[in-house]
């Protein structure tokens, strides 16, 4: 099988892991808009492409798929997931399987208020969230929530334009300067990252890897430690059973008063996925099984606890003309 990894950026490990699974009977092609994306040089072949908002971007990607006889395509950045999901039929018509959830669920994942409402409607614990200043102030006045609060864009990634709100003056200022926002209760407890694989044939959860985040950097997990809790596994399975996600997704969860609360869902490989892979949760094997039209057997909780992941800088040296 030949794999196309879009917008690979600095995700060298993902390219390397894909090669370990698919490299024996296929090859890995990577793309990015910059020749200075180091992951390109871990692939068997690479293309420098326009940014994803270029009017010909999709046609360029489809041409690469045809020219390279690509079997599987996936992206590593949020803004591109919706583009792929919108055009699944175009990929499938040339024999390419996009590893992405259905468009409806990609859109819900990237609209934090929609995700909040979905969780509330399906009795899934989630963080209290509001999309209007009036609603927030009413909750404060009735003492249902208190300062500090947490503000962030309704859609977005990489922890951009987020703010801890300490008082009414900061609240008013943030809401005045941000067009689409949500205000949430502030969570200062343990944040947990969950790498989840959902079988694309059966719709069942195949694997879950959970880690407590020890340090974050630019919205990605920098240091974390693995752990297991059947209560958390059941919480995630309930969410998946109510939703329509498939393949690999990344879920962020908080703990409050002994209960798990869903925070966000990213329908792609999360920045902390290498932790899961190195602990034996090989989602590329699961993808390969599904592409071969076979179901994966569930193996939730098969990894070891107390395994720490610590990211560190690495360099790529290339001669360029």
Task: Show the residue positions of the predicted features.
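Short, charged, surface-exposed secondary-structure boundary motifs
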Residues: 38-41, 56-59, 107-111, 159-162, ...
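ATP-binding N-terminal substructure of ATP-dependent carboxylate-amine bond-forming enzymes
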Residues: 1-99
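Short catalytic-loop micro-motif centered on adjacent basic/acidic residues
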Residues: 4-5, 72-75, 127-128, 182-185, ...
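A short glycine-rich, hydrophobically flanked beta-strand micro-motif that places a catalytic Asp/Glu
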Residues: 246-257
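ATP-dependent carboxylate/phosphate-activation module, predominantly the ATP-grasp catalytic core
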Residues: 184-244, 248, 266-293, 301, ...
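Preference for protein termini
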Residues: 1-29, 68-69, 200-202, 206, ...
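Active-site nucleotide/adenylate-binding loops and adjacent lid/helix of ATP-dependent enzymes
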Residues: 106-188, 200-202, 230-233
């Amino acid at each position: 099988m030949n794999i196309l990894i879009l917008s690979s950026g600095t995700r060298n490990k993902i390219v390397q892991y894909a090669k370990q699974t698919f490299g024996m009977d296929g090859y890995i092609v990577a793309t990015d808009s910059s020749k200075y994306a180091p992951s390109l040089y871990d692939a068997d072949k690479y293309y420098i492409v326009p940014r994803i908002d270029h009017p010909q971007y999709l046609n360029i990607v489809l041409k690469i798929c045809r020219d390279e006889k690509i079997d599987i395509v996936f992206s590593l950045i949020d803004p591109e997931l919706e583009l792929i999901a919108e055009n699944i039929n175009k990929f499938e018509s040339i024999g390419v399987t996009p590893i992405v959830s259905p468009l409806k669920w990609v859109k819900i994942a990237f609209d934090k208020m929609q995700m909040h409402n979905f969780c509330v409607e399906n009795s899934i614990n989630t963080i209290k969230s509001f999309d209007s200043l009036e609603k927030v102030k009413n909750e404060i006045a009735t003492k249902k929530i208190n300062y500090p609060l947490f503000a962030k864009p309704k859609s977005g990634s990489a922890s951009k334009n987020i703010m801890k709100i300490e008082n009414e003056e900061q609240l008013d200022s943030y809401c005045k300067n941000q067009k689409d926002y949500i205000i949430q209760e502030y969570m200062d407890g343990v944040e947990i990252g969950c790498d989840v694989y959902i079988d694309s044939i059966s719709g069942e959860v195949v694997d879950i890897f959970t880690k407590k985040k020890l340090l974050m950097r630019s919205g990605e997990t920098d240091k974390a430690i693995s752990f297991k809790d059947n209560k958390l596994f059941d919480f995630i399975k309930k969410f998946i059973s109510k939703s329509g996600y498939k393949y690999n997704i990344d879920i962020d969860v908080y703990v409050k008063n002994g209960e798990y609360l869903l925070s966000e869902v990213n329908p792609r490989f999360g920045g902390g996925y290498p932790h899961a892979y190195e602990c034996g949760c090989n989602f590329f094997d699961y993808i390969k099984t599904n592409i071969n039209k076979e179901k994966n057997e569930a193996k939730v909780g098969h990894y070891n606890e107390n395994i720490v992941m610590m990211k560190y800088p690495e360099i790529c040296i290339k001669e360029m003309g």
